[in-house]
């Protein structure tokens, strides 16, 4: 909150509602109702973030109900997260005070939730792309209670494609009325969050304006904040060095300058002194080969099957695989690789092992500490040796991404701030991220799969069907641990 004061944009927040996400997740902290309550006194805290433990809400879990009751009592917005929740369970969820949902993957589900009085956030991000399936919501009367969101989006996508402006462009290209699409990306969102002083061009509202070249390409020519020209032709104006952002311009992102790097390092050095815990969030032993031993318990193995452009997974049951030179259970022919998640906040030594399918990896390993929502260390690979190397590279960097193959680390991106953020400029991060993506393609990962964003969601036990975290493989619908081999 303090870091976003005095910027040339207004930053608002909603408080995390589920830390950890469910009882079958392991985070670095636990936030209860009393931990959240004081922040509501800040006018820039608008409400409660996505209530993802829908099973707990429907069951009337005490701590969750306490958070919902407090937010509701204060008239705060309560965001939802309830994929596939229908019927009486949806009724119970809505009765608990949840206002919205951003997890709809088809129009039928969205229309049922609209019919229960919820708002629908139409999501189009890097990994989850639901816009095309939800285009019927751009028709009257549905569009009046819908808005546009990205959920997670890689920095490179923000630079090259844009943010909400990209979703508007994409919707218009799919046949949406441009005025409706713009309204869903501006006024509707402001109305939902209770920001009555902005969101439209009219007397009495704040002069926060985006000037477009036309209503077809939705290209932003200029931006005004509080009536003052703040950006023009992709260049941020005003105090400090002017910095061009090539979002939505179709240009290749440039790498950051030496001055950018030195400035970032100087700033991060001061922050590291002020907030040592944020820069020292990795508390785990080195990963060893014996940590990856997954014993065969039966003739079958359970695979977490990825779906292109979706966060949803499927359960796939196949005979146990044995291929010389690969980890037990792994099969390149069947597109099955091993997955492991290691707790890294509190030095518990907890881990979960399993298998994922549809990732496309043909050799080597990929590791990341960007793993929603607890952000433990996750690694997938075809063999244990490369998995150990990739995992330990992330640990050594105190967070980040790493790729290993044929016995060596071939690429890495350090994210030492909480294990999820970089000291570098967005251009430098994107340059390194693209280099890593090239490596993952060389290792076989399909262009239909975002190698890192896909892994970032595979450990979140609130999106069906299967996930993997430090508890092991989780059946989300049943909120139950299930064996990877049986």
Describe the function of each predicted region.
Residues 1-75, 141, 410-413:
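Divalent-metal coordination cores built from histidine and acidic residues
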Residues 5, 40-41, 72, 94, ...:
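Alpha-helix boundary recognition
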Residues 15, 82, 343:
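Short beta-strand/turn micro-motifs composed of small residues
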Residues 46-185, 190-200, 209, 213-214, ...:
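Active-site core of metal-dependent hydrolases
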Residues 159-175, 179-486:
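Active-site microenvironment of metallo-dependent hydrolases
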């Amino acid at each position: 909150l303090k870091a976003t004061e005095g910027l040339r944009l207004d930053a608002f927040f909603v408080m995390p509602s589920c830390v950890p996400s469910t009882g079958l997740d392991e985070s670095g902290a636990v936030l209860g109702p009393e931990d959240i309550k004081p922040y509501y006194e800040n006018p820039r805290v608008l409400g409660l973030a996505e209530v993802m433990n829908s099973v707990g809400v429907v069951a009337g879990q005490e701590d969750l109900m306490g958070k919902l009751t407090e937010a509701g009592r204060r008239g705060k917005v309560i965001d939802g997260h309830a994929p596939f929740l229908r019927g009486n369970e949806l009724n119970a969820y809505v009765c608990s005070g949840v206002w919205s949902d951003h997890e709809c993957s088809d129009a039928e589900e969205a229309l049922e939730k609209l019919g229960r009085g919820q708002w629908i956030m139409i999501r189009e991000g890097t990994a989850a792309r639901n816009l095309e399936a939800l285009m019927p919501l751009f028709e009257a009367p549905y569009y009046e209670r819908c808005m546009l969101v990205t959920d997670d989006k890689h920095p490179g996508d923000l630079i090259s494609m844009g943010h909400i402006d990209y979703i508007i462009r994409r919707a218009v290209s799919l046949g949406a009325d441009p005025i409706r699409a713009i309204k869903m990306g501006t006024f509707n969102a402001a109305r939902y969050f209770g920001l009555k002083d902005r969101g439209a061009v009219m007397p009495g509202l704040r002069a926060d304006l985006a000037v477009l070249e036309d209503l077809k390409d939705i290209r932003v020519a200029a931006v005004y904040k509080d009536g003052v020209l703040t950006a023009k032709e992709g260049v941020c104006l005003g105090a400090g060095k002017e910095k061009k952002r090539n979002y939505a311009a179709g240009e290749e992102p440039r790498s950051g300058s030496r001055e950018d790097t030195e400035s970032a390092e100087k700033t991060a050095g001061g922050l590291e002194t002020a907030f040592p815990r944020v820069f020292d969030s990795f508390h785990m032993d080195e990963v060893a080969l014996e940590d990856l031993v997954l014993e065969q318990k039966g003739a079958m193995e359970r695979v977490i099957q990825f779906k292109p452009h979706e966060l949803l997974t499927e359960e796939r049951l196949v005979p146990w695989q044995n291929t010389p030179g690969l980890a037990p259970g792994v099969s390149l022919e069947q597109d099955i690789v091993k997955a492991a998640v290691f707790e890294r906040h509190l030095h518990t030594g907890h881990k979960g092992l399993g298998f994922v399918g549809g990732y496309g990896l043909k050799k080597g390993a990929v590791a990341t500490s960007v793993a929603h929502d607890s952000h433990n260390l996750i690694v997938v690979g075809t063999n244990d040796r490369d998995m150990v190397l990739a995992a330990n590279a992330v640990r050594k960097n105190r967070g980040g991404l790493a790729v290993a193959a044929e016995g060596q680390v071939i690429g890495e991106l350090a994210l030492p701030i909480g294990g999820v953020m970089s000291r570098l400029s967005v251009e430098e991060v994107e340059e390194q991220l693209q280099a890593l993506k090239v490596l993952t393609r060389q290792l076989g990962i399909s262009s239909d799969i975002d190698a890192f964003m896909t892994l970032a969601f595979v450990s979140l036990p609130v999106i069906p069907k299967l996930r993997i975290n430090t508890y092991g493989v989780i059946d989300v619908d049943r909120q139950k641990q299930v064996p990877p081999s049986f």
